[in-house]
Amino acid sequence: LSMIPFHTGRAREKLDLLLSQEYRDGHTNHYFFPIEGYEPVTRIHSDNHLWVVMAVYALVMEEGKLDYLKRDIPFYDGEKASVWEHLKRSIDFVYQNIGTHGLPLMLHSDWNDMLYKVCREGRGESVMVAFMLGLALRQMAELAELMGEENDYLARYEAMKETVNRVAWDGEWYARATMDDGRFLGVKREPMAKIWLNAQTWAVLSGMAPAQRAHQAMDSVRRYLNTPLGIKKIDPAMADYPTPEDPLTYYNKGCGENGSVFCHANAWAVIAECLLGRGERAWEYYSQLLPMNAQAKAGEWRYKAEPYVYSSNIFGPESDKFGLANVSWLTGTAAWMYVAFTQYLLGVKPVWGGLSIEPCLPPQWESIEITRIFRGCRYHIRVKNGEKLFIPHEEGRTHYERTDDTTI
């Protein structure tokens, strides 16, 4: 995603490579090794194939052209099809794997690798993937219209939106998943892991959360998950849960997937707050996780990582190592934070009709200036803070509604 604004040619090459890892039924390899030549990791995750939809959509919006959708790419298990056909099969694969609650099956896991245990018997479902599907369906509907194809993507979107709000809302936030036994993970009645970050952020990113729930879910994130060094992945951290004999994770409390500040996921919180029109909170979440700021607050002796690169995670407050940065350089945080900052805080975002200018700024910023090269032109953009450029998330809206023409 972060490569696309700088070099669409390189981005096309990477997308060609990624799409070649898709199977004819629409799922993809989880890992592959084009340099080393190792055999790919073929376990099926419920989220992999949806990221490709979002990446191709971003490329099309950047270029303002449909030719890449018509390019033929081979499937991993043989035959060729257009990129557009690849994307359609990615969506169809989700619908071939729907659980008893009407949500996408978790399969081996979703974005959170720790959740592989919730679907070992094939019945666990992912609320996060339901929301990811929502965003992908909206993007597919727009692409289909541009391609001149009749489609039912928006109808599917509305149906999944109704389902996830009916079965996964827990009163103050959204559940994270269901387990094989039908029990929900990430709800108040459970003794641990009551709230999970990704279910709340993606409820907003997808547009599936009604306005009141969107605000309430993100307010719960702030209340239960935010720390001075970033937003935790879950709260409270787990120990011997759901059973001592077969816990979801063996990580200590506050470590890794078990209650750390997982940096990659923080970028989605920045985007979610921008979509709600809360620039001050979005900037707080963005700035507190900047490596130099996190290191300064934790202290060099505690942080123990470079102040100029993101780490995968930072040990959370339930650990006696709170503030220790873990696995620097190996994370999607930088790419997603770039998207969060440029397209949502600064609000300069490619759309089919041009370059949308819809900033969501913290009140202490008087103005911003941005230079953006877009479709062969160099734009220099000045925005004075306080000018009403958008109406934040309200019922029935998935993103900002323009109050006047803010696309150039």
Per-segment meaning from a language model:
Residues 9, 15-27, 50, 57-127, ...:
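Active-site acid/base region of carbohydrate-active enzymes
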Residues 35-39, 110-127, 181-191, 238, ...:
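Active-site-adjacent structural elements in folded domains
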Residues 223-226, 239, 251, 255-258, ...:
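Non-catalytic C-terminal accessory modules of carbohydrate-active enzymes
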